Curated annotation (Swiss-Prot):
Gene: lpxH
Localization, UniProt: Cell inner membrane
Organism of origin: Salmonella arizonae (strain ATCC BAA-731 / CDC346-86 / RSK2980)
Name recorded for this polypeptide: UDP-2,3-diacylglucosamine hydrolase
Role of this protein: Hydrolyzes the pyrophosphate bond of UDP-2,3-diacylglucosamine to yield 2,3-diacylglucosamine 1-phosphate (lipid X) and UMP by catalyzing the attack of water at the alpha-P atom. Involved in the biosynthesis of lipid A, a phosphorylated glycolipid that anchors the lipopolysaccharide to the outer membrane of the cell.
Cofactor(s) essential for the protein: Mn(2+)
EC number: 3.6.1.54
Length: 240
């Protein structure tokens, strides 16, 4: 009896080892789970469900196979794949969740999210996020031809990489006060998120009690997952 969480795989054809590792994960570890939650940035980029990238179809088939085996899969959008829509969700069998969700996991209330909304010290990113999450902006973008969307996405990624190279590590991490505020708003003692690529279990205080923030790692040379059972919450790194 276990529920699994992963995030920040950043799947792309240029990283076949990570793709292969994810396929093995779906076929082995995930098959034993009660449910799988993907907390954003499953893909390196997403320019629309109509993108004919063969990798997208391959991943949809693999996730659907997991779901058809009896393991439900849930998805929270990340900052790289926030345009994943109902079509891909239907093809993959995933259930799309809001950006914040509280789960009852074996009697333990747990708040889950991608994590980028916690990085409130990065004012530039938060301003950009507000723009691209505007429904009108998204609708307009999705009406553009695919080749134009690809160019825009490539420019945005290049700009983001350049901007991040000049930012301090602290600015790109979560804001401690924002974390506590979110946990107290939802009245939880556990928070699981990704985004920062800094896997760790942090102890803090929220709601006047001990609390825990569990941060998933990105998939690079190894995979990262959080395994929640009735008795424990584990952050686990594993070879790909």
């Amino acid at each position: 009896m276990a529920t699994l969480f992963i995030a920040d795989l950043h799947l792309q054809t240029e990283e076949p080892a990570i793709v292969a590792g994810f396929l093995r994960f779906l076929a082995v570890e995930a098959r034993q789970a009660d449910a799988l939650y993907i907390l954003g940035d499953l893909f390196e980029a997403w320019i629309g469900d109509d993108d004919p990238n063969p990798l997208h179809r391959e991943m949809a088939v693999a996730i659907k196979s997991l779901v058809d085996s009896g393991v439900p899969c849930f998805f929270i959008h990340g900052n790289r794949d926030f345009l994943i829509g109902k079509r891909f969700a239907r093809e993959s069998g995933m259930t799309l969740l809001p950006q914040e969700k509280v789960l009852d996991l074996y009697g333990r209330n747990v708040l889950i999210m991608h994590g980028d909304t916690l990085c409130t010290d990065d004012a530039g990113y938060q301003a950009f996020r507000a723009k691209v999450h505007n429904p009108w902006v998204q609708r307009l973008f999705l009406t553009l031809p695919l080749f134009i969307r690809r160019r825009i996405a490539a420019r945005l990624r290049a700009g983001s990489k350049a901007a991040n190279s000049s930012k301090s590590l602290d600015i790109m991490d979560v804001n401690a006060q924002t974390v506590v505020a979110e946990m107290e708003k939802h009245r939880v003692q556990w928070l699981i998120h990704g985004h920062t690529h800094r896997p760790a279990v942090h102890e803090l205080s929220a709601n006047g009690q001990p609390a825990f923030r569990v941060v998933l790692g990105a998939w690079h040379h190894e995979g990262s997952m959080v395994k929640v059972t009735p008795d424990n919450v584990e952050l686990i790194a594993f070879p790909l």
